[in-house]
């Protein structure tokens, strides 16, 4: 895993998350980075380079495209263990019985 130096990793989504307030999310990501966290971007689909460049301003955080995989799996395959996810669609991050409706909430 790429975050074996003891640092924690935060992953941001693009569409529906970062795109809602790019300047704000950039500041938040910088706060994480300046506090020693590793910042990555995990998106479900390919993004135009121009869009990525505009979003990240001067930062050079890795962008991982999950495609058909759950985002956690895509990040893992890219060598990252994510500790905190910032995403408007948590069901795209990892398999979750509660979100599927077969959890124990109704027990």
Predicted features and spans:
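C-terminal cap/substrate-recognition subdomain and adjoining C-terminal extension
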Residues: 35, 48-107
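Alpha-helical substrate-recognition element adjacent to the catalytic core
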Residues: 1-72
